């Protein structure tokens, strides 16, 4: 079994995404594809992100989660929920300002039997770089702390594109 997976369920425009294991850069194309398909669904109202079984999450993934949260708020006016039961992950999402775009819940969801695993998509190095750049620009747009934290990374990635 892989050390990571993304599970999904949907009912009446409410999506549930559960992240299991180490959610890192290797899943950015899979996650971005999922975010795009969800946000293009005309019935999409909101999303519940479950990180209760997430061991590691990187800033690229956080940027893509911010993207879907902002889309939910724009499309329906509903603030999405994020479940985080691990203190380290809760601290990271708090430091990124996620409490301004998510309702943060510290209790795990009890029933997840309807979730289906999302297959991992392979991506080229350029596609991964593009997703990393987009995700970090989203994080930078959330607050000044994130802007300061990621400006050098974004600058370096933009220089690689033009170089």
Each language-model region and where it sits:
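Histidine-anchored nucleotide/phosphate-binding helix
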Residues: 65-69
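Residues immediately C-terminal
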Residues: 56
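STAS-like cytosolic regulatory interaction modules
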Residues: 1-53, 71-163
């Amino acid at each position: 079994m892989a050390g990571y997976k993304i599970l999904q369920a949907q009912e009446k425009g409410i999506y549930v995404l559960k992240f299991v294991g180490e959610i890192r850069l290797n899943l950015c194309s899979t996650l971005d594809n999922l975010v795009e398909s969800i946000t293009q669904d005309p019935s999409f109202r909101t999303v519940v992100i479950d990180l209760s079984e997430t061991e590691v999450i990187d800033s690229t993934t956080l940027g893509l989660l911010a993207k879907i949260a902002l889309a939910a708020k724009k499309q329906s006016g509903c603030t999405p929920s994020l479940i985080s039961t691990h203190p380290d992950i809760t601290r990271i999402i708090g430091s990124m300002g996620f409490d301004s775009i998510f309702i943060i819940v510290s209790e795990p969801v009890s029933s997840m039997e309807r979730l289906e695993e999302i297959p991992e998509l392979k991506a080229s190095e350029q596609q991964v770089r593009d997703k990393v750049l987009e995700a970090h620009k989203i994080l930078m747009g959330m607050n000044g702390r994130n802007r300061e934290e990621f400006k050098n990374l974004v600058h370096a990635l933009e220089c690689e594109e033009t170089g």
